[in-house]
């Protein structure tokens, strides 16, 4: 349903943000 899709997108977004944050800390 719509809820599961929203959860999936949320997890994807969190992963992307986490990756970018890790990159910034490494620099």
Swiss-Prot record:
Post-translational modification Glutamic acid 1-amide, affected residues? 27
InterPro entries found in the cross-reference section:
Cupiennin
List, in alphabetical order, the GO biological process terms annotated in this UniProt record: defense response to bacterium
At the top level of its lineage, which domain of life is listed? Eukaryota
Q: Which UniProt keywords apply?
A: Amidation, Secreted, Toxin
Name its cellular compartments. Answer: Secreted
**A Pfam family per the record:** Cu
Q: Tell me, what is one Gene Ontology molecular-function annotation carried by this entry?
A: toxin activity
Tissue expression per record: Expressed by the venom gland.
GO cellular component terms attached to this protein's record: extracellular region
Establish whether keyword Secreted is in the entry. Answer: yes
What protein family is recorded?
Belongs to the cationic peptide 04 (cupiennin) family. 03 subfamily.
Descriptive protein name: Cupiennin-3a
């Amino acid at each position: 349903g719509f809820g599961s899709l929203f959860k999936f997108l949320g997890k994807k977004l969190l992963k992307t943000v986490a990756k970018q944050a890790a990159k910034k800390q490494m620099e």
